[in-house]
Amino acid sequence: MKKSFSYNNMLKKNNIFLIGPMGAGKSTIGRQLANQLNMEFFDSDQEIETRTGANISWVFDVEGEERFRDREEKIIDELTKKQGIILATGGGSVKSHITRNNLSDRGFVVYLETTIEKQLIRTQHDKRRPLLRSSSASGNTRDLLQVLAKERNPLYEEIADIRISTDEQNVRVVVNKIIILRKKSSL
């Protein structure tokens, strides 16, 4: 996790960026957090869908993961330049070093953690997640989630200002923890 808190870090704290694996609750928590703090909410996946006029799965299938990640990187770069926003990112967005730098440099980064068991429960009926669609068809969703966790968890940890588990806590509790820990970090 990041340790240094300079004057620039103090200025960037008016943005909150939520990172973590699929099913961690980034979008749900982000909306509630934005509502409570009276800030504008963005979801990078929804932005991609709005701008392309297609759902994430279609974009992923037609353009491929590499092109999807390029598009995601550009959208996150644009959104993180705004001030006073909450941004829920896609689980794989941290694969881009440019995105990691932008998130880290331009906002307070919250790593929402969850176990693979909770991910399986929370995403079992979600047909919009391209990586899960292909794995569930072959019956190895758990294996895929383990591979993704091994690849991505160190990247989440690298840029996180704080980490919060969403496994056994309701949305309101997580939102309040984020608000409290954000205030403490800016002191």
Curated annotation (Swiss-Prot):
This is Shikimate kinase. It catalyses: shikimate + ATP = 3-phosphoshikimate + ADP + H(+). InterPro entries: AAA+_ATPase (IPR003593), P-loop_NTPase (IPR027417), Shikimate/glucono_kinase (IPR031322), Shikimate_kinase/TSH1 (IPR000623), Shikimate_kinase_CS (IPR023000). GO terms for biological process: amino acid biosynthetic process; aromatic amino acid family biosynthetic process; chorismate biosynthetic process. ATP binds at residues 23-28, 129, 169. It is found in: Cytoplasm. HAMAP family: Shikimate_kinase. Its cofactor is Mg(2+). Mg(2+) binds at residue 27. Belongs to the shikimate kinase family. One of its GO terms (cellular component) is cytosol. Pfam families: SKI. Substrate binds at residues 45, 69, 91, 152. Its EC number is 2.7.1.71. GO terms for molecular function: ATP binding; ATP hydrolysis activity; magnesium ion binding; shikimate kinase activity. Monomer. Pathway: Metabolic intermediate biosynthesis; chorismate biosynthesis; chorismate from D-erythrose 4-phosphate and phosphoenolpyruvate: step 5/7. PROSITE patterns: SHIKIMATE_KINASE (PS01128). It comes from Blochmanniella pennsylvanica (strain BPEN).
